[in-house]
Amino acid sequence: KSRGLGDVYKRQVHINQTNICVLACRFCAFRRSKKQSDAYALTIDQYITEMDKFAEHIDEVHSVGGLHPDWDVDFYVDLISAAKQKYPKISIKALTAVEVKHLSIQSNISFSETLLRLKHAGLDSLPGGGAEILNDEIREIICKGKESSEEYLEIHRQAHLAGIPSNCTMLFGTIEKIEDRLIHMDKLRKLADESSMLQCFVPYPFLPDSSRLPQAQLA
């Protein structure tokens, strides 16, 4: 790819809109409940203020966060629309598959409709986070309550059908085996074969820190 297209990179900033989450994945040290003292949820104005700090130096903003119990698709439509209105040239990569699922449940609409509404608001692409390991037995242990393996793939599939490109990921070093990693990558390879909308694969190691997963391999 480097030889054929040249080196490609983005100048981006990460803005995590909230750490409040209705789930409590065992590997996650980011999540907070609404009652915890260090819980936060940015207003739309606060989000735009964060963009203001970096706007001259970036061409993309990357935003993921917790599953806030009070936010539905309307909130994100308003947030993305406001960001695009002020910074139309900055690409917005936001919302992992489980966030899309959460918004669809909160708003009682399909994955497809959720994604189309977000696209019309100005969403440019989806990050790949949340894939973890695409094995539902493992997911039941490390991230109980998140989207299933098939739901992760289907949400990315629906995004591609809506014209929204996406990334994909793999979290390794929790409790999975090498075989699980290979199966995971094969599932993503098959998804990539369905369209040209899968932009990149990002594997990243588990970092224990303050997580609640003592049996992790730390690979």
In which residue ranges do the predicted regions lie?
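Single conserved hydrophobic/aromatic residue that forms the stacking wall/gate
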Residues: 1-5, 9
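Canonical Radical SAM [4Fe-4S] cluster-binding loop centered on the CxxxCxxC motif
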Residues: 11-46
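Generic structural signal for well-ordered alpha-helices
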Residues: 51, 76-81, 112-116, 153-156, ...
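Conserved glycine-rich "GG(E/T)P / GGGxP" loop and the immediately following alpha-helix
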Residues: 61-86, 103-107, 176-180
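Alpha-helix-loop-beta-strand connector modules within alpha/beta enzyme cores
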Residues: 71-95, 121, 148-165, 219
